[in-house]
């Protein structure tokens, strides 16, 4: 105890040197700890999200992109699925079938065109307001409502894909009807609308505003006055879709088969399809994380080299310190301090430095993963 106290007093007198040593050791420990914990947190979040999503059907292409698109609304789907495919799956009775149309954003948040079944499927609860019921209605995720500073009764315009395309589709004004309770998943980031509203955003459906039509002129400038589309009780009945609605696009279809037999039937349905594919997200995510783990193994080897170099440098510093303190140690010996006590003092100094470095590294790694956990839960694509 006396050795620890004396060592502590010594280090307090040399705070800068002690602080540099603590910071160096802590940094060498922090990097592998933070990397391991962050990867584990990401693996847990991605695995949990995938485990609650039995199957995803979408355009044939990158399996990773399709799964991330269906789970996180981030990666872009390489193609589309006709709405008729959704209808066929639902009528086949394989289980619960949910449409997804995710191509646009509103205020930087992904606009998720789906059905009310999605809320039941993900076990999403309303925190405020009501669910979407009409064209143009939207429900915000917990993070989306905070980022957009909106709540029930507010309005939100969709983002233009190309700000310089004045002849392109107009943004659609969405009416916020409710806010979802926080789940800590990608659903917190979404702006949820009915799939028909998503088609209107895509320009596949439109309505007619009679009041504007009566006052309109044929001059080009009259068209440019219009800045966005708005669905109101007065013009809602005029909105319609041209052509066959069964041919309208979806970006993915979520399928929750009732049992293993239905799962096999859905997989077999698309096994030989050249345009569509059915994937099991848990399998794809495991493969994806396997690649991440291999990268982590490479980083672990690098961290081992860094730790070794840090250890050698620390040993050199200790050796030089002993040489610089040789006269000090000799004076202590002449005053009656034995060589064993001197060794105990220097050991106590190293013990304090390493303990402080370990505590600092653990705290920093824990804080980093804690800060990034919500981001990791929604990050993909």
Place the predicted regions along the sequence by residue.
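N-terminal Sec/SRP start-transfer signal
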Residues: 1-33, 338-339, 347-350
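Feature of multi-pass inner-membrane transport and sensor proteins
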Residues: 1-13, 43, 47, 54, ...
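Interfacial "coupling" helices/loops that link adjacent transmembrane helices in transporter permeases
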Residues: 14, 313-352
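Alpha-helical transmembrane segments of integral membrane proteins
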Residues: 20-31, 296-316, 353-361
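Hydrophobic, regular-secondary-structure patches
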Residues: 32-110, 117-120, 134, 242, ...
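Hydrophobic secondary-structure segments that place a key small or acidic residue at a functional site
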Residues: 105-115, 125-228
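Mechanotransmission and gating elements of multispan inner-membrane complexes involved in transport
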Residues: 170-171, 179-296
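Short helix-loop junctions at transmembrane helix boundaries
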Residues: 356-381
């Amino acid at each position: 105890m006396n050795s620890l106290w004396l060592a502590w007093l010594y280090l307090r007198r040399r705070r800068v040197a002690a602080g540099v040593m603590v910071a160096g050791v802590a940094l060498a420990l922090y990097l592998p700890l933070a990397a391991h914990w962050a990867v584990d947190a990401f693996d847990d979040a991605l695995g949990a999200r995938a485990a609650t999503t039995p199957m995803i059907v979408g355009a044939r292409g990158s399996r990773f992109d399709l799964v991330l698109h269906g789970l996180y609304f981030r990666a872009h789907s390489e193609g589309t699925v006709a709405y008729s495919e959704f209808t066929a799956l639902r009528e086949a009775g394989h289980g619960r079938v949910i449409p997804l149309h995710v191509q646009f954003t509103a205020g930087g948040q992904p606009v998720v065109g789906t059905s009310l079944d999605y809320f039941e499927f993900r076990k999403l609860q309303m925190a405020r307001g009501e669910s979407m019921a009409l064209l143009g209605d939207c429900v915000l995720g917990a993070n989306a409502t905070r980022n957009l500073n909106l709540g029930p009764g507010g309005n939100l315009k969709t983002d233009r894909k190309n700000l310089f395309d004045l002849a392109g589709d107009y943004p659609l004004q969405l009416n916020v009807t409710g806010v979802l309770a926080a789940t800590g998943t990608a659903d917190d980031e979404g702006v949820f609308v009915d799939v028909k509203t998503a088609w209107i955003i895509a320009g596949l459906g439109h309505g007619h505003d009679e009041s504007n039509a009566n006052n309109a002129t044929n001059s080009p400038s009259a068209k440019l006055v219009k800045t966005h589309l708005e669905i109101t009780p007065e013009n809602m009945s005029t909105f319609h879709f041209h052509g066959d609605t069964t041919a309208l696009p979806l970006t993915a279809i979520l399928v929750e088969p009732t049992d293993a037999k239905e799962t096999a039937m859905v997989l077999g349905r698309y096994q030989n399809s050249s345009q569509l594919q059915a994937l099991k997200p848990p399998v794809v995510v495991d493969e994806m994380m396997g690649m991440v783990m291999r990268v982590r193994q490479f980083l672990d080897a690098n961290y081992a080299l860094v730790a070794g170099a840090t250890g050698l440098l620390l040993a050199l510093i200790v050796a030089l310190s002993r040489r610089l303190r040789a006269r000090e140690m000799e004076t202590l010996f002449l005053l009656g301090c034995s060589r064993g006590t001197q060794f105990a003092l220097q050991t106590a100094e190293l013990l304090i430095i390493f303990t402080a470095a370990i505590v600092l590294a653990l705290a920093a790694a824990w804080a980093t993963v804690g800060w990034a956990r919500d981001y990791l839960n929604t990050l993909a694509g």
